[in-house]
């Protein structure tokens, strides 16, 4: 995981670092997600279904997509903090995602504007991993951006 100091965080800096060995990249999407109070929980899921080409890439392929998640407000358990199951892209957790022990494998992210919650190779952690949002009791705003 790449940790970038809070004051110097920049989406393009992160993408440049991840794609330095494979060449150019494009900022392909960006959106702001708002989780409203008492929103229903979103269960663990894998975002790779959104990118079918990833299913045909060998494990040795360079990262094709990097998704960055930045909380615009503090992400807490009460307002729906995202959890990531690291290494879940390897498929070992596929049949146990909802099973016992999942909380011990899940890492919660972050504080408002905290780049350490976003400046990682999300191909391995978030995009091919899983996320979960608990019932929100107040607003949570997240910025998502993808480079490919």
Curated annotation (Swiss-Prot):
Cofactor(s) of this protein: Fe cation
Lineage: Eukaryota, Fungi, Dikarya, Ascomycota, Pezizomycotina
GO molecular function ontology, one term from the record: metal ion binding
Pfam family, one: PhyH
UniProt pathway annotation: Secondary metabolite biosynthesis; terpenoid biosynthesis
Stated family: Belongs to the PhyH family.
Species whose genome carries this gene: Emericella nidulans (strain FGSC A4 / ATCC 38163 / CBS 112.46 / NRRL 194 / M139) (Aspergillus nidulans)
EC class name: oxidoreductase
Record-linked SUPFAM superfamilies: Clavaminate synthase-like
Function: Iron/alpha-ketoglutarate-dependent dioxygenase; part of the gene cluster B that mediates the biosynthesis of austinol and dehydroaustinol, two fungal meroterpenoids. The first step of the pathway is the synthesis of 3,5-dimethylorsellinic acid by the polyketide synthase ausA. 3,5-dimethylorsellinic acid is then prenylated by the polyprenyl transferase ausN. Further epoxidation by the FAD-dependent monooxygenase ausM and cyclization by the probable terpene cyclase ausL lead to the formation of protoaustinoid A.
Name this polypeptide is given: Iron/alpha-ketoglutarate-dependent dioxygenase ausU
